[in-house]
A protein has these predicted regions:
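P-loop NTP-binding/switch modules centered on Walker-like glycine-rich loops
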Residues: 94-172
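Q-loop/switch helix immediately C-terminal to the Walker
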Residues: 12, 19-33
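Conserved ABC ATPase signature
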Residues: 63-68, 72
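Charged, flexible cofactor/metal-binding loops and thiol motifs
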Residues: 147-218
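A short, proline-enriched helix->beta-strand linker immediately N-terminal to the Walker B motif
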Residues: 83-87, 116
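Conserved ABC ATPase "signature" region
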Residues: 40-59
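ABC ATPase NBD coupling module
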Residues: 1-7, 25, 33, 151-156
Length: 218
């Protein structure tokens, strides 16, 4: 979906691009909607490809989508989106499969390339959601919770939101205690759903049937 005012950046660039048409042809189709003259289209296309990080845009113009890597195809879809006057940018999992540094680079790129457009990010990545102004939590197609990203992700009301945050392997939304200054505190205290004030002061030792544990829980 590449309209004049609304553009969509898909999760998979290869599925979005037409394998039977060159990248030049697909960019030219979008430029025609924007009103770019035929004599200016090659220059305009190279400019957009350069903006998304291609050092040899002329080579990319001659290629087809099946000749591109996944990352290259994704950048071409962003270049296509640039051939618009987007007021709304919809990005479906724009950081899927990327490491943390690449995620930040992608989000920064979208912000710099579309400074005046509203951005709707569809994501399962909490770090991406945290970079947004507002979040909407969906489950089974239903809205369960919405609000500012900082409030929803730090103090969720709905059990589903709480479960999502609690399921994070890195548990990045919680602070890791400083064990040098919090002597005697259970190291899991800040992240444990069963924690009480007692856990801040003691770690009772228990044993049974050859097993040992340091917790008040049976």
């Amino acid at each position: 979906m590449l309209g004049r005012d609304i553009v969509y950046i898909p999760q998979n660039g290869h599925e979005f691009l037409n394998p039977s048409k060159s990248i030049r042809s697909q960019l030219f189709d979008s430029m025609e909607k924007l009103g770019v003259g035929a004599s200016d289209r090659d220059t305009f296309a190279c400019e957009k490809l350069s903006q998304v990080g291609f050092s040899q845009p002329e080579t990319i113009l001659r290629m087809y989508s099946f000749q591109l890597s996944g990352g290259m195809a994704q950048r071409v879809t962003i270049a296509l989106a640039l051939c618009s006057k987007a007021r709304l940018l919809i990005a479906d999992e724009p950081t899927n499969g990327l490491d943390q540094d690449s995620k930040q680079q992608t989000l920064s790129l979208l912000n710099s390339l579309f400074p005046d457009a509203a951005k709707l990010m569809i994501t399962h990545d909490i770090s991406v959601a945290a970079a947004c102004d507002r979040v909407l939590v969906l489950c089974g197609g239903r809205m369960l919770e919405t609000g500012s990203a900082s409030e929803v992700l730090s103090s969720p009301h709905h059990p589903y939101t709480k479960a999502l945050l609690g399921a994070l392997v890195e548990n990045g939304m919680q602070e890791t205690p400083n064990l040098r200054t919090e002597t005697g505190v259970c190291p899991f205290y800040r992240r444990c759903p069963a924690a009480t004030e007692l856990c801040r002061r003691e770690m009772p030792h228990q044993s049974a049937q050859g097993r040992e544990w340091w917790c008040r829980e049976e």
